[in-house]
């Protein structure tokens, strides 16, 4: 094996997504379609808070996959596949914002049916509440969190999305955003402070600590 071949094989042993991408690189039938099915919704969820529109996020996700396909023959894994893909997505989202020179509006991730996800908020509510009360509480809290996220700058917002929705660590977020791990830690720290200021009044009124929503 060549040095590049050995490197690819080593990464592939650790990351099934890389193995799938290597199948795409080899033009294996059905591999690219499988890759799209695996990551399309995740890309939309990541980019929607950045660009403010599900339709635009879907368009950018398609563009990201197009770039992946066009560059497949030059693909040589140097990190997790998801990190490489999300780097492409982040750059596309930032380029879209720069070209439009507008402030994005943040909305909650949605399911395939278009309904807003509540990211487990209902599990955190007291059991004694009735279902109508829980639904009203969820809607109110989702609106508060959406507005809080909208108050973050672009970098803070992306760092929060990658950290919370994709469960990415500082090092991987740093690769995606072109920053150092220390800078990512600082971004998330400032984002938590900003979120705490917006959320604390609502959450403290419920007698709950805001930490569970920020950590």
Name these PLM-found stretches.
Residues 4-5, 10, 25-34, 44-63, ...:
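Short, charged helix-capping/linker segments at alpha-helix termini
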Residues 25-26, 52-53, 65-80, 99-101:
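Sigma70-family region 2
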Residues 26-29, 101, 122, 126-158, ...:
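Amphipathic alpha-helical segment used for protein-protein interaction
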Residues 38-41, 49-52, 142, 161-168:
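Short helix-capping/turn signature of helix-turn-helix
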Residues 59-66, 79-91:
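Structural recognition of an alpha-helix C-terminal capping motif at a helix-to-coil junction
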Residues 73-77, 87-108, 199:
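Arg/Lys-rich amphipathic alpha helix in sigma70-family domain 2
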Residues 94, 156, 162-165, 170-201:
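DNA-recognition helix of helix-turn-helix
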């Amino acid at each position: 094996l060549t040095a590049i071949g050995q490197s690819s094989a080593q990464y592939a042993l650790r990351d099934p997504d890389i193995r799938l991408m290597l199948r795409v690189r080899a033009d294996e039938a059905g591999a690219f379609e499988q890759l799209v099915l695996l990551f399309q919704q995740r890309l939309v969820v990541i980019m929607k808070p950045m660009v403010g529109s599900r339709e635009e996020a879907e368009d950018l996700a398609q563009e990201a996959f197009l770039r992946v396909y066009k560059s497949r023959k030059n693909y040589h894994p140097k990190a997790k596949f998801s990190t490489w893909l999300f780097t492409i997505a982040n750059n596309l989202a930032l380029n879209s914002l720069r070209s439009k020179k507008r402030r994005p509006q943040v909305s909650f991730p949605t399911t395939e049916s278009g309904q807003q996800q509540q990211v487990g908020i209902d599990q955190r509510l007291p059991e004694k509440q009735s279902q109508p009360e829980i639904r009203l509480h969820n809607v109110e809290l989702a609106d508060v969190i959406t507005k809080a996220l909208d108050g973050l700058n672009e970098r803070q917002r992306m760092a929060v999305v990658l950290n919370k929705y994709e469960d990415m660590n500082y090092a991987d977020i740093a690769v995606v955003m072109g920053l150092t791990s220390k800078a990512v830690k600082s971004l998330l720290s400032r984002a938590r402070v900003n979120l705490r200021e917006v959320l604390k009044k609502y959450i403290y009124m419920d007698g709950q600590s805001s930490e569970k929503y920020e950590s």
